[in-house]
């Protein structure tokens, strides 16, 4: 039986693990050969010392080698936050996904239940009536027929069951928060990724480039793992093989600045109700932050020339009823009913 202890000792000593060692360590954890205490110790040793790009790449290689894939169009994208920002905000990326799909871009949305927050993507979507445990074929059909499919991480990364209890007990972000956006079961090449800390912007953009992404924006919104209308958003953009960094304020793209309190979410049922309100056209700070993120996603998808154009398309997606229609179709298809 393989032993995680040498890798724990190495990480705890402050020594970075080469990609091969990182993959080997994650292979041990993902195959059920490590105890919960060992997993927790290893994850926190990495976090305290600071995870490196080779360690993330090795962990992703281990996860990808075990995942159950989903077939999606070549131009599909993912819109995902790492979680772990401790903000308790609304499910911005989930709502954004429906708006982007309503604007004509296929979305293969990867997400999980809450691990370090009150309501994760899966919690809110399940509360809306989506069958989050649909199989890979049904999800592929949902993407092609409804424009969006939701991939519940534990269904596609079943090896994660070995580390899930340790993550919940730790109750804080770990390297696994970084891995979700990098381990999309549909192997999308375009991503809008929200990150929990600004020091990860450029490293994650480099990891995405190494993993074959064509276009991606990695964003940090002043305490949020999404673009924010309550402050300044920092962006590391992978475009045409190059990575550039810049900042965005809501005012410069014609949106209202709000207070962080206006973006506070609640439990899954409350967040689901708020998400539905946005798709039904209700005006709110939640709508504005969704418009900002949707505009950016449409730029990443190549559908919009710039952020203002993307926001205009997002407004049209909501106000025409297209985004709400996507939600209704996804609910139907995920529950094996005609769209």
From Swiss-Prot:
Mg(2+) 1 binds at residues 93, 226. It catalyses: N-(5-phospho-beta-D-ribosyl)anthranilate + diphosphate = 5-phospho-alpha-D-ribose 1-diphosphate + anthranilate. Anthranilate 2 binds at residue 167. Anthranilate 1 binds at residues 81, 112. Pathway: Amino-acid biosynthesis; L-tryptophan biosynthesis; L-tryptophan from chorismate: step 2/5. GO terms for cellular component: cytosol. Binds 2 magnesium ions per monomer. Disulfide bonds: none annotated. SUPFAM superfamilies: Nucleoside phosphorylase/phosphoribosyltransferase catalytic domain, Nucleoside phosphorylase/phosphoribosyltransferase N-terminal domain. Catalyzes the transfer of the phosphoribosyl group of 5-phosphorylribose-1-pyrophosphate (PRPP) to anthranilate to yield N-(5'-phosphoribosyl)-anthranilate (PRA). HAMAP family: TrpD (MF_00211). Belongs to the anthranilate phosphoribosyltransferase family. This is Anthranilate phosphoribosyltransferase. It comes from Brucella ovis (strain ATCC 25840 / 63/290 / NCTC 10512). The lineage of its organism: Bacteria, Pseudomonadati, Pseudomonadota, Alphaproteobacteria, Hyphomicrobiales. The gene is trpD.
């Amino acid at each position: 039986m393989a032993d995680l202890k040498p890798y724990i000792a190495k990480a705890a000593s402050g020594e970075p693990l080469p990609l091969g060692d990182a993959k080997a360590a994650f292979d041990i954890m993902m195959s059920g050969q490590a105890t919960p205490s060992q997993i927790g110790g290893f994850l926190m040793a990495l976090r305290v010392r600071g995870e490196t790009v080779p360690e993330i790449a090795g962990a992703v290689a281990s996860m990808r080698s075990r995942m159950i894939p989903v077939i999606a169009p070549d131009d599909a994208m993912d819109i995902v936050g790492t979680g772990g920002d401790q903000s308790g905000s609304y499910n911005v990326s989930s709502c954004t996904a429906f708006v982007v799909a309503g604007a004509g871009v296929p979305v293969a949305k990867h997400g999980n239940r809450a691990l370090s927050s009150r309501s994760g993507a899966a919690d809110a979507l399940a509360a809306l009536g989506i069958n989050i445990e649909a199989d890979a074929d049904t999800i592929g059909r949902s993407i092609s027929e409804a424009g969006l499919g939701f991939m519940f991480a534990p269904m596609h990364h079943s090896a994660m069951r070995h580390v899930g209890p340790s993550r919940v007990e730790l109750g804080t972000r770990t390297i696994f928060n970084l891995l979700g956006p990098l381990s999309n079961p549909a192997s999308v090449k375009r991503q809008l990724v929200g990150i929990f800390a600004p020091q990860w912007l450029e490293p994650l953009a480099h990891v995405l480039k190494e993993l074959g992404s064509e276009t991606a924006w990695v964003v940090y919104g002043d305490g949020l793992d999404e673009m924010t209308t309550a402050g300044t958003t920092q962006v590391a953009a992978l475009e045409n093989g190059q990575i550039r960094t810049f900042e965005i304020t809501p005012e410069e793209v014609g949106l209202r600045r709000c207070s962080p309190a206006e973006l506070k979410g609640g439990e899954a049922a409350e967040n689901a109700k708020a998400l539905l309100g946005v798709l039904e056209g209700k005006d709110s700070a939640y709508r504005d932050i969704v418009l900002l993120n949707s505009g950016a996603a449409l730029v990443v998808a190549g559908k919009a020339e710039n952020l203002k154009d993307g926001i205009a398309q997002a407004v049209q997606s909501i106000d025409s009823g297209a985004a709400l229609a996507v939600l209704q179709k996804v609910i139907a298809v995920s529950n094996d009913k005609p769209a």
